[in-house]
Each structure stands twice: as C-alpha cells, then as structure tokens.
A protein has these predicted regions:
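Active-site and adjacent substrate-binding regions of carbohydrate-active enzymes
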Residues: 1-593
C-alpha cells in the first residue's frame, strides 16, 4: 500500500471537510494511502456473489459496542471461506445517524466510531488481497440537514451554496410527486426558519434534496465519486437515483435529466476507472428500471447493475400461493437488458421487505401471510429477516436461497441469513433486522467485548433465533448446518457459469406448483447447461417437462453428481418433495465421465 502523503495545510484530512470563509473545503485522495487494485475485469460483477454487511453490526474490534472497519478486516477470512466475491457496505460516512447513515453529514469523512479513511483503505487493501471486491452506498439524492453545504445554503442564499438545494417560497410545487415515507412525513416540503423558505425532500425532512439543476452540485458529486475511486473502491450502489431532478406535472421520478447525469457518471467510470461498477437502487417497475442501464446499442452507458425490486416479493408470494405464476409473470414483464448489464437480485436486506412494486390486493395478501403482528410492518413493507418470514423452515430457506442463486442476476446475500438469524420486532423502525452478527454462544454473541449495555443494539436472545443456538461457531463445525449448506451451494454456483451469464428459458410444465427453467451458456468456449426445478408447494409434486430440445442429454444432479435417466422424446417426469428443488447439469453423451 502506498504511504500516505502529507497534507500541506494545517488540517488533518482525517477530520474531513471544513468551512473557510464561507467555502467548504474537502480533503483530497492524495492525502491518504491507496489500496492495491485488483486486475481490470469489466464484467466481474456478472459472475459475483454479493454480501451486504452493516459495518456497525458485523464485528467490534475496538470494544466500544459498535462494529467497525477494523473488525470487518478481522472477519474477511470468514467471508472468503464462505465464498463471497464482493462486499456491499451501506453508508459509513460521517452522519448524525437519524436514518442509519443515509443522512450524510460529510462525504469525505468516515463516521468516527467506524474508524478513519485510513482504516477504510486498509479494509480495501485486505479485501483485495483475498480477491474480494468492495462497493458502498453513495447517497446522491440528498444529504443530512447538518451537512455544511446545507448550513451554508440556509445561512447565505446568495453565497456559493445558496442554490445547492431545492428551495421555494411555496409548498405547492411538484404536487404530483408521491410521499415515500407515509408513516412519518405529511409533505415533501419543510419550512426552514433560518432562510424562511421551504426546502424539498423526497425522504425524511432532515434529508434535504440536492439541486441537480445546479451544475456545481453535479460536479461536487462527481468529485465525491473520484475521491473514493482513487482510494481503490470497486464501485457504488447509487441510492435513490430516480429522484435526482424535479419537474412540474410529473411524479419527479425517472426523468430524462436523471439519465443524462448518470451517463456522465458512467463516462467518468469508463474513462478513468475501468472495471469499477455503478449499481442503481431504483425501486421501480422493470420497464422503468431497465432505462437505468442506458443505451442497449452501446451495451449500456448508465449503470452496470440495477436491483430487480418487483421480483423479490413475488418469490415470497409464489411460495405461499404454491403457484409459479407470480414469478413467471414478473419475469415475462422484464425487458431484455444491454449485453454489459446485470440485474441484482435479493431476498432480504437492511430495509423492510418493500411492497411498493405490488398491487394493493397483493400487498394486503403479503401483510396477511407474512406480517400477522402489526409491529412487523414498516412504511410500505415488512421488517423481518428471512428465517422468521419462512417460519424457520429449513426446506423453505433452502428453496428460496436456491432460487436466489439460480434466477437471472447476481445474488445479494444479507449478513446473518447464511446462519438463519432472526429479528427483534420490538426494536424501532428497521433496527430489528440490523442486530449484531452472531459469531459464538459467548457473551454479546462474540460480536464485542464491551459491556452489554454499551452495544448499539442488543443481540438476539430469542429461544429459537438467539445467539446461544444460532451462531457461526456452532454451524461451522456441523456439516449439515445451514451455513455449510449455503457455502456448498455458492461453490456449486461458481462452478457453473450458466447461473451467472447464461440465457434464461422458463419451461412451463404440467404442474403450476413447480417452477422449472434452464440457464444455458454457449459462447467464447464455455458450454454449460443448468436445469433448475423448484417445488413451490409444501406437498410432494410431480412434473412432466418438455425437454426434447436436449434429447440424448443426461441430467446430473450438481451437488451429489447423481445421474438421472437420459432425456428422450417423451415428457421428462420428475417428483419433488415438498419445498424441494433440483439443480441438474445437462451433459451430452460425450461429456459424461
């Protein structure tokens, strides 16, 4: 790692930005050391398995009750052992923490309880040494109201930051824009007593939206990108990107101006940092989200990846209804994406299980099935972890994970789901799904040596999901544990490139309770065919599949290498146990050992 260069001014760059004569001065990347960079690979994200980890929740190396960057470094060997290719870190920037770090006070400073910029560079370097990439959230739409840009904007409307935010003398503009946080916000406008104007916010009132109609704001955010990319980060999940611009008589989402700015960001990446990645967080319908990949004729010139939000709730819906059609229909509605693009798919993350992209009837059904206790609801979603959502049913957990790893897109795991961690529904907001990682049955779940009262949140002590019974140490030693099963499935997926970059063909079949599809890769010397069959019913189910296209091929089960009867002209009959699944590799006669 390069030695850190000395800052010529009498100011420690680790202290972040500062205000001098009404101007906010930011540190430079050359003030810090830089991490080693992995070999350039412009398509690594298409084959990667992502793992979302909250820095605060993973491991506390400083024994102050909160996880930190040094603690994450200590656990990189576990993540390498598990089979993770890329870490996704939610915001670790300096913040008043009124919204879990998504209210950023300084883009150029690490939250002190997490560490320093040098600690982050050390994390990047240690991860890259193990072949693990790291991306983080960049909240582009808004800042905290304690950010110096906002403080200068409200104090001095005629100063350099006076137009950094969206101000108005009235709260009636952009009336067609929906309110996102309906539980807490009555309006997208809030009156500021200092400037005596209203400011615009799509999220909480303490998160004013930046004014992207101001070119200075666009360049300021590009500078933030460059700062962290220079240090060695592998990419960004761009948070809340549909809302960057506002226009009257629109819903202020997915506007052409937003796409133009993202093209500018992508050009910076391609020209200056090839191999780095932009991942769009756009909770929209597939036809709208696909626009965030950019021009298909160029292979994509906006974001490299985008989350497929509507797919996730329909996986839950399909299994509870014991019908493949919720999944089949949303995949059929998903347009093709550019060649250099990839979906990101997930089951759970640090937010609620969002139900924005379902109909009112479907939302009521999901609440009735998965959130019987009113405390389980949050905003327009359900604040529960995967294992409790599935009633801790190992067969369901395995089925859901198998679909996550085999449907089109790069899978994103959420920390703790690999061991079946539970939630604490009596904690406020979404904290119930953000509790400490459960490493051992020892005090504080092995997460921290601090006194229990110092912990940022209590570890789960539930009789079923508590750390005394659900922890990494116990499961790592058990060959039949969920942890070792997950590790095995990640290894199987890595051996079969069709899961990552193969085509997708749904097979239909005689039984609507069974979802069957083929992932096939045949290019650049790689030939791989994966047949996936998923029983969405709790009861055993038969299925007849038309596999004539692969006549003469032999299905070989991927985990045990068991050969099934060769495929012929007749429908291929399989019987699956309740919530069971098969992963087959289809082998031509000349490929069989």
């Amino acid at each position: 790692m390069d030695a850190a260069r000395q800052n010529p001014v009498d100011h420690d760059p680790a202290e972040g930005s500062r205000v001098e004569d009404g101007v906010v001065e930011h540190p430079n990347a050359d003030d810090f050391g830089h991490a080693r960079v992995l070999p350039e690979d412009r398509t690594w994200f298409k084959r990667a398995v992502f793992y979302e980890v909250l820095v605060r929740a993973f491991y506390d190396a400083s024994a102050d009750g909160s996880g930190d960057l040094r603690g994450l470094i200590e656990k990189l060997d576990y993540l390498k052992w598990l089979g993770v290719d890329c870490l996704w870190l939610p915001p670790f920037y300096d913040s008043p923490l009124r919204d879990g770090g998504y209210d950023i006070r300084d883009f150029y400073k690490v939250l002190p309880e997490f560490g320093t910029v040098d600690d982050f560079v050390a994390l990047l370097d240690a991860a890259h040494r193990r072949g693990i990439r790291v991306i983080t959230d960049l909240v582009m739409n808004h800042t905290s109201d304690s950010h110096e840009w906002f403080q200068e904007s409200r104090r001095n409307p005629d100063g350099p930051y006076g137009d950094y935010y969206v101000w108005s003398d009235t709260s009636q503009k952009y009336a067609d824009a929906r309110i996102i946080f309906v539980d807490t916000e009555e309006s997208n406008w809030t009156f500021d007593p200092v400037r005596k104007q209203f400011y615009w916010h799509r999220f909480f009132s303490h998160q004013p939206d930046l004014n992207y109609d101001n070119p200075a704001v666009q360049e300021a955010m590009i500078d933030v990108l460059r700062f962290w990319l220079d240090l060695g980060i592998d990419g960004f999940r761009l948070d809340a990107v549909p809302y960057l611009f506002e226009r009257e008589n629109t819903n202020c989402e997915n506007l052409p101006e937003t796409h133009a700015f993202l093209k500018h960001c992508r050009k910076v990446i391609d020209d200056e940092y090839p191999g780095r990645v932009l991942l769009a967080e756009a909770n929209q319908w597939p036809a709208d989200v696909v626009e965030y990949f950019g021009d298909p004729d160029t292979g994509g010139d906006e974001c490299h990846m985008a989350f497929h939000f509507p797919l996730m709730p329909r996986i839950f819906m399909a299994v509870r209804r014991e019908s493949r059609f919720p999944i089949s229909e949303i995949l059929a509605q998903t347009p093709p994406i550019p060649e250099m693009a990839q979906w990101g798919i997930f089951l759970r993350n640090h937010d609620e299980l969002t139900l924005e992209m379902v109909t009112d009837e479907e939302r009521d059904y999901m609440y009735a099935e998965y959130a019987k206790d009113p405390r389980m609801k949050a905003n327009v979603g359900i604040r529960r972890r995967l294992a409790p959502l599935l009633e801790n049913d190992r067969n369901q957990i395995e089925l859901f994970t198998a679909m996550l790893l085999s449907l089109p897109g790069s899978p994103v795991l959420y920390y703790g789901d690999e061991i079946g961690m539970g939630d604490i529904i009596w904690l406020g907001d979404r904290d119930g799904v953000r509790t400490p990682m459960q490493w051992t049955p020892d005090r504080n779940a092995g997460f921290s040596k601090a006194n229990p009262g110092q912990l940022y949140l209590p570890p789960n002590q539930d009789p079923i999901y508590g750390y005394q019974s659900v922890n990494v140490e116990a499961q790592r030693d058990s060959s039949s544990s969920l942890l070792n099963w997950t590790r095995t499935m990640l290894a199987v997926r890595r051996r079969h490139a069709a899961f990552a970059i193969g085509t997708f063909r749904e097979l239909g079949g005689s039984n609507p309770s069974v979802l069957a599809y083929v992932r096939e890769l045949d290019r650049d010397g790689e030939h791989d065919i994966a047949l996936c069959v998923n029983n969405l019913s709790r009861f055993p189910q038969p299925i007849e599949l038309n596999l004539q296209h692969w006549n003469g091929y032999t299905p070989v089960e991927m985990t045990g290498y068991v050969e099934f009867p060769p495929i012929g002209q007749l429908p291929y009959l399989l019987t699956l146990p309740g919530h069971g699944f098969y992963w087959f590799s289809l082998k031509a006669s000349e490929e069989k050992p």
